[in-house]
Amino acid sequence: MSGLIVIPGKLPGVLLVQPKEFPDKRGFFTESYHAGKYSAAGIPQPFVQDNYSYSLKHVLRGLHTQVKQPQGKLVFVVQGEVFDVAVDIRRGSPTYGQWEGHVLSAANHHQLYVPAGFAHGFVVLSDSALVMYKCTALYNPGDEQGIAWNDPDIGIRWPVPHPVLGDKDAVLPRLRDLPDDRLPSLA
């Protein structure tokens, strides 16, 4: 696809997206999103909500999902650098409990598509980071669920051993402790 490189991740549906950059003496230009190109590349549409978060060094946000209205997310970094993680938590999935992570940064312009039904989180590697993400479903606070960032059964190798956590993220349960009705199903 012209102007867009899409690399399948190790987990089904996870995609690493590398938009083409057009540099010149003034700086550079890149398309951060183009509905037609992204749809043709296999990234589900439509996106119905855009979010951004600003976080300081070593802040870890996650792992988050929605159960009945799962969100696919297209994640990219406008400022700074993060280690971004997707975890398959879909009941019945052959890759249930498996994860993959990628460094996303303002310098590399890489994006990560995290499919609906996956948990998502990131930790900030730079002094601060501005992370933006497009969602395929609207946020519903009554539908949210989280998984412990350091769940030993998942075994994510975070590059920051002692992250800064928000109050809610600090007390999230392990995946094995969630009843089936608090997990997304394999669609």
Feature map (PLM): residue ranges:
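Non-catalytic, conserved peripheral segments adjacent to functional cores
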Residues: 1-110, 126-128, 135-187
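Short alpha-helical functional segments enriched in proximate histidine and acidic residues
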Residues: 121
